[in-house]
Amino acid sequence: MVKQKINYKSSLAYYDIAIFVKDYISENTVIVCIGTDKCIGDCLGPLVGTFLKESSFPLPVYGTIESPIHALNIDNRINEIKKIHPNASIIGIDACLGDTKSIGEIHTRDYPIHPGKGVGKSLPDVGTISIIGIIDSSDSYDFFTSRSIRLYLVMEMSKVITHGLTHAYDLFLD
């Protein structure tokens, strides 16, 4: 298993994401962004999905602020996506909890996301590969009510991931 840790503030963060993702991206790739806008800490995925859609990203993107994929609908939405794209390679994107020193890191991994794991939920794995953004500490008393997560952090990390995916697609075309 390969995992790369990238600080979102690095000027080359988008490039590091792109270099990793380019080896997995193809015309048969689908982007699945997990989370909800009902919680600042959980909106990283839907923000990435929204930014990709707004930029006319050429690959299918699921999970946006308007139409999120979250704990209550993930089973149905993933089944729908797999029916529409039966042979697709999926890149899963989600927010994650981690150590305090890891907040602000973006991890690119050659294995799926385990959504809900950090908050004790058992949901289906998503993705052939995954990109997670660590937005808060797992030491926080309650992820869903934590007031320490800044929307600015989530927005900036979402922009970096979006830029990385866009650049990865450009590298794939070259």
Residue ranges of predicted features:
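N-terminal catalytic or cofactor-binding beta/alpha core of small enzyme domains
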Residues: 1-174
